[in-house]
Amino acid sequence: ALIHAFLLNEYGHAVYHRKETYSLITREGEKKEKTLTEEQEKAVKALCDSIDRKAYEGFLLKGVTGSGKTEVYLQAARHALEEGGSALILVPEIALTSQMTSYFASIFGDKVVFMHSGLSKGERYNNRMRIMSGESPIVIGSRSAIFMPFKNLRLIVVDEEYDTSYKQGETPRYNGRDAAKVMAVIYHCPIVLGAATPSITTYYAACQGKISLLTMKERVFKTPLPQIHVCDLKENPPIDRSGLISAPLISLLQ
């Protein structure tokens, strides 16, 4: 009645429920900037230059385990934000979403949102609206996150691009990695396919020059890779009931 009598003005404002998802990742020291290695700096520069060109371009970031690929993703996403855009980081498994989200949220805070099928309808709606409004320009999720309503998408990252979990088995069937490539073409932005052991098709495309190859051969802290010993089971037949464990392995375990 007071509104109709012009004694009060009515305003509308959307309020989205926000879970305290990042309560465990704001410990002191986690927000410190990391010093990039020479290989990381080269990769970041290549991606940032591509973001500035505002055109589709494919990259294969081939780095050994522990080489700091995630930090490269983070720095490239930071540049996308500085240019007024958003970034999508895809991971193959839902279980990896929270791990990646925690890493990014320790730097970007509430600008990070995650999307996957394990969320409730209310959570998916809230996160979708935050993405659409640009409130959370960094989106981390599984393959379904590809179809979010992005605002000025400037970077797409597909981590562990070889993983078969990116393939949707049910109708509609699609490969999340390939769908991400199409989205990169639509949004005129670079796409980064990251892996220590890329798929044959992706690596072949890089070798043929269809996409750019960025390599990181050294670990961040110069720690050596674990030594691998090949054991011929014909010469060292398994001696356990399962028929899987050889005598040398049992000896090392004991």
Where are these regions (language model features)?
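Accessory, non-ATPase domains that flank or precede helicase/AAA+ motor cores in DNA-metabolism machines
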Residues: 1-195, 202, 207-223
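Conserved interdomain hinge at the start of the Helicase C-terminal
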Residues: 74-80, 231-254
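Interdomain motor-coupling "hinge/lid" segment immediately C-terminal to the ATP-binding subdomain
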Residues: 209-210, 214-243
